[in-house]
């Protein structure tokens, strides 16, 4: 019997897969436990529409991420901070600070978890990588200057 999986089933496949299962397994276990539904023509059509909508949504998100990466490319974030001896900062500059500066300077909301940067403790120019989408990332300059 062909069934559409509604949840991941270890021995059969992932949610949304169209799989063959034995009649007894499907009727007595998968369907009653709402792990799968029978693959009628209508259900298969609905599944295909959902998959197409998800594919279009991912393409749209990818395009938006690429636009954002292009707009971020070459940007410089400047921090003016108080420093102590040997050019060391009081405290440090983290990805959270970089995220806040991007919002302040360029009005761009970027989650701090998407920013990959070492913790900055001295003045100088550094690079921070921003991973916008799994395949899309860009780098920005982080300048730390004495106040």
Swiss-Prot record:
What are the GO cellular component annotations? Answer: ribonucleoprotein complex; ribosome
Pfam families per the UniProt record, alphabetical: Ribosomal_L9_C (PF03948), Ribosomal_L9_N (PF01281)
One GO biological-process annotation of the entry reads: translation
Q: Name one GO molecular function term.
A: rRNA binding
User: What does the function comment of this entry state?
Assistant: Binds to the 23S rRNA.
Known PROSITE patterns for this protein? Answer: RIBOSOMAL_L9 (PS00651)
Keyword Transmembrane helix (UniProt)? no
Does Ribonucleoprotein show up as a keyword for this record? yes
Protein's recorded name: Large ribosomal subunit protein bL9
Origin species, per record, is Clostridium botulinum (strain ATCC 19397 / Type A)
Write out the similarity annotation.
Answer: Belongs to the bacterial ribosomal protein bL9 family.
Enumerate the HAMAP family for this protein: Ribosomal_bL9
Q: Which UniProt keywords apply?
A: Ribonucleoprotein, Ribosomal protein, RNA-binding, rRNA-binding
């Amino acid at each position: 019997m062909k069934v559409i999986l509604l949840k991941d089933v270890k021995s059969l496949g992932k949610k949304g897969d169209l799989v063959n299962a034995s009649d007894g397994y499907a009727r007595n276990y998968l369907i009653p436990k709402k792990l799968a539904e029978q693959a009628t023509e209508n259900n298969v059509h609905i599944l295909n529409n959902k998959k197409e909508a998800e594919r279009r949504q991912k393409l749209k998100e990818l395009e938006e991420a690429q636009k954002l990466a292009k707009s971020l490319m070459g940007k410089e974030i400047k921090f003016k901070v108080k420093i102590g001896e040997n050019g060391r900062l009081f405290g440090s500059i983290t990805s959270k600070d970089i995220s806040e500066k991007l919002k302040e300077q360029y009005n761009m909301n970027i989650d701090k978890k998407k920013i990959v940067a070492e913790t900055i403790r001295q003045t100088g120019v550094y690079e921070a990588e921003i991973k916008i989408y799994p395949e899309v990332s860009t780098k920005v300059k982080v300048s730390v200057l004495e106040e």
